[in-house]
Structures are given as structure tokens and as C-alpha cells.
From Swiss-Prot:
Belongs to the protein kinase superfamily. CMGC Ser/Thr protein kinase family. Lammer subfamily. Residues 177-192, 314-332, 356-366, 439-462 have a biased composition (Polar residues). This is Probable dual specificity protein kinase madd-3. Disruption phenotype: Viable, but sterile. Defective extension of body wall muscle connections or arms towards the ventral nerve cord. Reduced expression of the late endosome marker rab-7, and the eva-1 and unc-40 receptors, which are expressed in muscles, and impaired recruitment of madd-4 to the muscle membrane. Double knockout with cup-5 results in increased expression of the eva-1 receptor and rab-7 positive endosomes. Double knockout with eva-1, gex-2, madd-2, madd-4, mkk-4, unc-15, unc-60, unc-93 or unc-98 results in severe muscle arm extension defects as compared to the single knockouts. Residues 108-118, 217-241, 407-419 have a biased composition (Low complexity). One of its GO terms (molecular function) is protein tyrosine kinase activity. Keywords: ATP-binding, Cytoplasm, Kinase, Nucleotide-binding, Nucleus, Serine/threonine-protein kinase, Transferase, Tyrosine-protein kinase. Its EC number is 2.7.11.-. Residues 551-863 form the Protein kinase domain. ATP binds at residues 557-565, 580.
């Protein structure tokens, strides 16, 4: 955009400030590129994400740990005129709209709370000797107790002893809701006093009257709901004046005259309660389901005494627990909890509330809550005292999350209680072992055996036979109902629990049956030992083995990727035969089936065996191995060449072998077959006997007969069948196969040309294992590859019609040293040698269409030197037994 130049307004020879600012502006201003309509910058996107993450509907999750308001639960139960019936559904928690406060508005009759000071509780050591609670007059602002049942006495532990001076009172809050929510000054002062007590780490010396201050939570609400069922089944006994337990939140319902009820079967769909370590202290329990229109269940008010939201535990004489865990005592409470829970860390355990699991056993919920609170308080004691065993005196324990603030003291439990709880713990562990054994027997064998737990106590292992049968406890019944065992498995578990270790001793009949079972697999394995296969799929055999009770194996004639060829004696004809045993691999079995198809076609076209191809006598399947039976031949022309130290065949033998080979392949081509795997290894002598003579003082083997047969039709392909991209062995592979231009019968002619060169020289023409090097050797021996083929190929071997080959590389040096033009390989210039190389040159033409056909090759002048008697194939007489030298 253009910039208008303005004159500099000078006053007194000095330029003005505006003029200097204009001079500093850039000469060219590039307008900012306009964003699209819905463009959101990175900063704005961050703000939007932050706003989405804010959620005020759940203060328990998105508020601080230190906020009391976020940790409150509805504490005052909804009163109902009718008693709470016993039901199998969990206690519902009334739904609270998110826009309302966490606690309901208090009634005008509620009074503010007076909290004791720390020093007021820890002083007066003389009160330790008192054995009973000292009643104190209730002031005008005393707590208003809830209605009591007739005949029951519920004592409220006062906040202070009567002998102590009155503590400083806090300013009353407008309501209990403000006190509980932490919005008033009372919550701040309580938090400050709690911090002061933690810093002093002093012990509470008052032993006569202990006050437990408890902020209600969902855990306590569920615990009180569990205790509500007890008055209906059993009347509450009159509790004695014993000291209340410091583990306030969840033990109270069980110790206020509500004995544990046997748990009812739990529904199969009810999920199990997660482990204690998995419960999050800030997790909000889900609302339990209840029927539509049903009123919320009311808690009995006779078991809880409240003063403006602060609950005091009623005293009870029942200190026993039935959960199988040892209570915390004055001498070894922390150790007992560590032994029971297997925990040595000081991790704070959730006491606010766990996910509400539908359960039919309300006392079981109380047991779980008791475990949570006991472990929490014991670990808190250990952390505050800094020792493994808590001190004898009580101390102030507070939850870091603000759920519980209580003055805990030592529990007064007897040795009988400890023994009873140990027995329950051992019984529960034995039950788990029994259930595990029942599942293992259901999945495996039918013998029920128990699994020993290394962590189990020695008491359960002593005198297993002398222990009388014990009835199933409530824990066992609850466990079985939770797992929903089938009837058969449940019967086994009951038998194991009733009989103890007697079920571990199997009967003699069971042992005899178990010993008799392995005999059947041994018979099968003994039958299979004769037909074992190795890791590659080859049949494992030894000399003298029988196949189908007809063929006796003598020795191995050859081995390849397809399988093995063995010499066998046919008991029917008493002659030696060659048995080709294919690998027990699906790929080679399918190839063998194709070979059988080709051999059957050749036998049909050549019933008199006049075309120099091998014929199959019979075939059969032997334990997954397809076996093909042939006439016994001699060694291959490659094996004989190798045994003769790669001395080339004489010219007359080369002439005869070439004639037979061209006629055999021509017979295949006439029947629309392509062999695709022509090589010296697949050309066998009918009789490979020889004589040895010295030539230049070196032994030289001379064959008696050069009659050959063409074998291995496993890769033979009919013209109408699918043609694989890559065929033939590497050294005898045609260029059109390497360049992936498609192949047909001329690829066999190329292979014949390579074989003729090897017969004449004794060495392989193209000794390589890489396509690019193979093409380079072809160009070195035969000249450049035609441009048409180079352009048609889809391979990456050519650049601009020329082979991508570096002549200065080490590979190029190897090609130059080992390859030379074809004519330079002639040993002499005799007419027969020249004629042979003419035939080889015509067979090794790059273009498949320009390559010599086999009928033309058989008319070549080179074969005019062959005697007529050698042009007729020899007859294979089954009565004769061809032998290999050395047999």
C-alpha cells in the first residue's frame, strides 16, 4: 500500500516527534493474510480447551483436597415413618442436584458446635486412673440426642471432661451447613487446630472419656444403613459402659448391638468391590438404583447421636469383628494390620466412600468400611509417631482429606477375640484355595486337589487329618454365591471344605486309572516311531525298514528340496526300484500330485517308452508322504561329471547325450508341456557303469553306455496352465524369465544350450547368483541384450536401454575373468567342434522367437555324425538289475 510522504515540520531547525516516527515506518507494508472465517488461533484454542476442562458440577473432583465443602456428604438421613425393610438391594443415596449445596439447610433448632482445644484434651494426667465415663451436665447448647429405642442406653462421649476447665468456645456459625461446608470461620479454626496438634505430635492422656469427632461421609452413611437391618432380626442388647472404639466411621454399626448377618447370595451381575488400594479418596460413589417412586430409605435414629452435623459413636460392648482381620491393639496394632493387609507403606487409604456395589449383605459392607478405616488410622498413627508400633496413649489422628478428625485411643480387646479373628482369616484363605482347586479340576482333570497357599499360617497345616469337619461359615457362603459356581463344582467345594485335607489323598483306583492312561499314547507312539518326520518334513528311515510290507529300503540315492530318492527292493518282482519319497509338506504334496498327472499323461502318449523320458511304475500315499516308484537308473550326468573331477565328456558322448536330450524335450513340447527345470542333475544315465584309464597320468572314468532318461517333471507345466513368474534353476534360466517378460517352451531350449556348453567344457556357463550379474555375464558371452527386451522389462536393470552395470567394480572384474565370448571357449577348430558351437549359439539367442526350435536342432548337421544304432533308445528290461559301480 502506498505511503504518503509528508513534509517535516521543523521548529527551530529540529524535526518534530511525529516526523521522526514517520521516518521509521517501513517503506513497504505487506498486508496480513486474511484467515478463513472459522480460524481459531493457538492461544484461543488453548483457552477453549481449558474452559472445556472446567467442570463445576462435581466439586469432589475439580476442587482442592483441602476444601471441606468438596468432601461433605448428606449426613442427616431422610426420616421415614415406616421402618426400613430388609431387602437385597443396596441403600440408595438421594440424588442431589448439582446447583444445590452439598448439605441440606439446617433447622432453626440446631445449635452451634463447641470444639475443644488441643491442650484441653491432653492435660489432666490424673484422669488416667478413672475406669468409667464421668457424666457431665449438658449445657444449654448441649447436643440434642436422637430418639432412642425403649430399653436401650446410648451414651454420648462428651467433648471435655468435667474436671477440666472449660475450653475456649468458637463463635457460633450461622448454621450447621456452614460449619460442615468449611465456608464459615469454624472450619478454618478446626483446620488450624488440627495442624497445631499434628505439629506438636502430643499424645492424649485422657483415658476415661474419649470423644470422636467425625465429619459424616458416604462411607458412614452406608455403614449406618447396614446397622439398620439388625434391630429387625435380633433385638439390640443393652450395651455396657465400655470405651468406644477409636475407629469411628464404619465400626459403629457393627458394635452397636447389630451382629453380623449371614450374607445372602449376590446377584451375578453385581461387580465385585475393587481393592482397597484402587479406591480413590476423591471418588464420588455412584448413586444406587432403586425402583421408580420408591421413597428413599431412612436410617434408624436410635443408633446415632448428632449435634449439628457432628456425630458421636455410641458405646457398645461388642468389640469383635467377623471379617477375619486382627484389630489394632496398643502393642502391635500396626504390625497386625501390616500382616493382614500385606502393606508396609504409609499410603493414605480412601475413607470418603468407595463405588457403591450392589450387595445383599449389609454387614459385609460394614466389614469393608471397617477395614478401610482401621487401616487408615493405623497407618496415620505410624506416620505421626515415626515408629513401627504406635504409643500406648491415644493421639489425635486426622485425615489429610478432612474426612475424619478424631481422638483415637487403644482398643481393649481380649486374646479370645484375636484367636477368633485369626481362625476366620485362616478359614477365608482356605476357602480361596478350595475355590481355585475347584476351577482347576473343572478345566483339567476330574480329580479335585487343593492349592496350597505359601502365605497361609502354620496353624491350618498342623494335624490336617485330626481336624473335625467344620461347617461352612458366612464368608464361605458369600464367596461361593459371588462366584456363581455350577452345581457340580459347588458340590466339590463343599466336599473339600467339609473334609479338609482328606480330599488331597486320591483313591487307589484313581491312581491306577492315572497310571493306566499313558499306556494308550505309548502304543500310538510306538506305531508312529516307524513314520517319524524330521523338522524339514523328510521321512526318517533306516536301512532295512519296510514300506507297506512290500518295499525294503537299502540306501539313499539322492536328496533335494522335494524329498529323497531311495533304492528299495520290491518283494513282488524281486528287483531293485527307485522310490521317490516326497516331503510331508503341503506345498510339495501338491507339486507331487501335478507330477503324477504329467507322468500319467506321458505314459499314455509313450506306452512303448521310446522317447527317453522316465516312466512311473506306481504311486501311493504313505503317512502323508507321496511315494512315486520308478525304474532304477544310474547317476546323473552332473554327478558323474563331478566324480570325474569335472573332466568334460568326450565329443562322441556329448553328441549322443545331446541327441537324446533334444528328443526327450521335443516329446514334451509336442504334448504341450514345458519342463522348466532342465539341468544336468535331471538327466540320468540308464547304466552308469564305467572303466577307469589314465590320461596324462590322471585317472579318467569312461562310461560304458551313454543312454539317458529325462526325469523330474514336478515343475512341468502345460501350455494352458498358469505360468509362474520365475522358473528354472539359476544357472540355466532364460533371459526372458529374469526380465519377467513371460516364458514358454523356448526357455527349455535355452537350458539345453547351457547344458551342452557344460558337457563340452565341464564348467557352468553362467556361474552366478544375482540377476544383474547374470545379465552382465550374458552380455559378456553373447553380446548386448536387444533394446526391445530392455525397454519392455519392468525390472530396474536397465537405464536408457543399457544395462545398469559398473565396469570398474569388483563384480565386473569377476565377470571379465570368468566369462569370455562363446567362440573363445572352443578347444579346437575341428568341424565337429565348430558345428557344436553353432548349435549352442542358435539355442542361446536372447529373443525367444529367434531361438532355434528343437525340430530344427535335430536336423542340424552336427547330428549327422551320430550312428543310427544310438538314435534308438535302449529298452529297459525289468528282469535286469542295473548296478552302480561299487555295488
Amino acid at each position: 500500500m502506498p505511503i504518503l510522504h509528508q513534509k517535516i515540520a521543523s521548529t527551530g531547525g529540529q524535526p518534530s516527534t511525529n516526523s521522526l516516527a514517520l521516518r521509521r515506518l517501513p517503506l513497504v507494508v505487506i498486508p496480513r493474510k486474511r484467515k478463513y472465517k472459522n480460524y481459531v488461533s493457538r492461544r484461543r484454542n488453548t483457552q477453549l480447551l481449558a474452559s472445556l476442562r472446567r467442570c463445576v458440577s462435581d466439586p469432589n473432583v475439580y476442587k482442592s483436597y483441602n476444601h471441606w465443602k468438596a468432601l461433605l456428604r448428606p449426613m442427616t438421613p431422610i426420616k421415614s415413618g415406616a421402618p426400613t425393610p430388609k431387602t437385597v438391594t443396596p441403600m440408595p443415596v438421594p440424588q442431589i442436584p448439582p446447583h444445590q449445596k452439598m448439605t441440606p439447610n439446617p433447622t432453626p433448632t440446631q445449635n452451634p458446635v463447641q470444639l475443644p482445644l488441643p491442650h484441653a484434651v491432653s492435660e489432666k494426667p490424673g484422669d488416667k486412673k478413672s475406669t468409667g465415663p464421668t457424666p457431665s451436665p449438658v449445657p444449654s447448647k448441649a447436643p440434642i440426642s436422637a430418639a432412642k429405642l425403649p430399653g436401650t442406653v446410648t451414651k454420648v462421649a462428651p467433648l471435655l471432661s468435667a474436671a477440666q476447665p472449660p475450653p475456649k468456645t468458637l463463635a457460633p456459625a450461622p448454621g450447621a451447613s456452614e460449619t460442615n461446608s468449611g465456608s464459615g470461620p469454624v472450619s478454618k479454626q478446626v483446620s488450624g487446630k488440627l495442624t497445631e496438634l499434628k505439629s506438636k505430635n502430643g499424645t492424649v492422656t485422657e483415658k476415661t472419656e474419649k470423644a470422636v469427632l467425625r465429619i459424616p461421609s458416604s462411607a458412614s452413611t452406608r455403614a449406618k444403613a447396614a446397622s439398620a437391618v439388625a434391630p429387625e432380626a435380633n433385638p439390640a442388647p443393652v450395651p455396657t459402659a465400655t470405651k468406644p472404639s477409636p475407629f469411628a466411621p464404619a465400626i459403629a454399626p457393627l458394635r452397636d448391638g447389630a451382629p453380623a448377618q449371614p450374607p445372602a447370595p449376590i446377584q451375578a451381575s453385581a461387580p465385585l468391590r475393587p481393592p482397597v488400594a484402587k479406591q480413590n479418596s476423591l471418588q464420588k460413589p455412584p448413586e444406587p438404583k432403586r425402583s421408580v417412586g420408591a421413597p428413599p430409605k431412612a436410617l434408624p435414629s436410635e443408633l446415632v447421636n448428632k449435634i449439628d452435623g457432628i456425630e458421636f459413636l455410641p458405646q457398645s460392648s461388642n468389640q469383635n469383628t467377623d471379617d477375619g482381620q486382627q484389630p489394632t491393639t496398643s502393642t502391635g496394632g500396626a504390625k497386625a494390620l501390616r500382616r493382614a493387609y500385606g502393606s508396609k507403606s504409609g499410603t493414605t487409604i480412601c475413607a470418603i466412600g468407595s463405588p457403591n456395589v450392589p450387595s445383599t449383605s449389609q454387614p459385609q459392607q460394614g466389614d469393608n468400611e471397617k477395614r478401610l478405616i482401621e487401616k487408615k488410622l493405623s497407618l496415620r498413627k505410624k506416620k505421626l509417631s515415626g515408629e513401627g508400633v504406635p504409643p500406648a496413649g491415644s493421639m489425635l489422628t486426622g485425615s489429610k482429606s478432612g474426612v475424619e478428625i478424631g481422638l483415637s485411643s487403644n482398643l481393649t480387646t481380649t486374646n479370645n477375640n484375636n484367636n477368633k479373628e485369626q481362625t476366620d482369616e485362616q478359614r477365608a484363605k482356605k476357602t480361596v484355595n478350595a475355590v481355585a482347586a475347584a476351577f482347576s479340576t473343572q478345566a483339567g482333570s476330574g480329580n479335585a486337589t487343593t492349592v496350597d497357599d505359601p502365605a497361609s499360617t502354620t496353624t491350618s497345616k498342623e494335624n490336617p487329618a485330626a481336624q473335625p469337619p467344620k461347617p461352612k461359615s458366612a464368608a464361605v457362603q458369600n464367596l461361593i454365591s459371588q462366584l456363581q459356581l455350577p452345581a457340580s463344582v459347588s458340590a466339590k467345594v463343599d466336599k473339600i471344605i467339609a473334609c479338609g485335607d482328606k480330599a488331597r489323598k486320591p483313591s487307589r483306583s484313581g491312581l491306577q486309572a492315572s497310571q493306566a492312561r499313558p499306556k494308550v499314547p505309548e502304543i500310538v507312539s510306538s506305531q508312529r516311531t516307524q513314520h517319524q518326520d524330521d523338522k524339514d518334513g523328510h521321512l526318517i528311515y533306516s536301512k532295512g525298514d519296510f514300506i507297506l510290507n512290500r518295499f525294503t529300503i537299502y540306501d539313499t540315492l539322492g536328496e533335494g528340496t522335494f524329498g529323497k530318492v531311495v533304492r528299495v527292493n520290491d518283494s513282488l518282482s524281486d528287483t531293485f526300484m527307485a522310490l521317490k519319497i516326497i516331503k510331508n509338506v503341503s506345498k510339495y504334496r501338491e507339486a507331487a500330485k501335478l507330477e503324477v498327472k504329467v507322468l500319467q499323461k506321458l505314459a499314455e502318449k509313450d506306452p512303448e517308452k521310446k522317447n527317453w523320458v522316465i516312466h512311473m511304475g506306481s504311486y501311493f500315499d504313505y503317512n502323508g508322504h507321496i511315494c512315486l516308484l520308478f525304474d532304477l537308473m544310474g547317476s546323473s550326468i552332473f554327478d558323474f561329471l563331478k566324480a570325474n573331477h569335472y573332466k568334460p565328456y568326450p565329443m562322441e558322448q556329448t553328441l549322443h547325450i545331446t541327441w537324446q536330450l533334444c528328443n526327450a524335450v521335443k516329446f514334451l513340447h509336442d504334448n504341450k508341456l514345458t519342463h522348466t527345470d532342465l539341468k544336468p542333475e535331471n538327466i540320468l544315465f540308464v547304466d552308469s557303469r564305467y572303466t577307469t584309464k589314465l590320461v596324462d597320468k590322471k585317472p579318467l572314468r569312461v562310461l560304458h553306455s551313454t543312454h539317458v532318461r529325462l526325469i523330474d517333471f514336478g515343475s512341468a507345466t502345460f501350455d494352458h496352465e498358469h505360468h509362474s513368474i520365475i522358473v528354472s534353476t539359476r544357472h540355466y534360466r532364460a533371459p526372458e524369465v529374469i526380465l519377467e517378460l513371460g516364458w514358454s517352451q523356448p526357455c527349455d531350449v535355452w537350458s539345453i544350450g547351457c547344458i551342452l556348453y557344460e558337457l563340452y567344457t565341464g564348467v557352468t556357463l553362467f556361474q552366478t547368483h544375482e540377476n544383474r550379474e547374470h545379465l552382465a555375464m550374458m552380455e559378456r558371452v553373447l553380446g548386448d541384450i536387444p533394446l526391445r527386451m530392455a525397454k519392455r522389462t519392468k525390472t530396474k536393470f536397465f537405464i536408457n536401454g543399457r544395462l545398469d552395470w559398473v565396469n570398474t567394480s569388483a563384480d565386473a572384474a569377476y565377470v571379465r575373468d570368468n566369462c569370455k565370448p562363446l567362440r573363445r571357449s572352443m578347444s579346437c577348430t575341428d568341424p565337429e567342434h565348430v558345428e557344436l558351437f553353432e548349435l549352442i549359439e542358435n539355442m542361446l539367442m536372447f529373443e525367444p522367437l529367434a531361438r532355434m526350435k528343437l525340430p530344427e536342432a535335430l536336423q542340424h548337421r552336427y547330428f549327422n555324425r551320430l550312428p543310427e544304432n544310438l538314435k534308438i533308445p535302449c529298452k529297459m528290461d525289468a528282469s535286469t538289475n542295473p548296478r552302480i559301480n561299487g555295488d
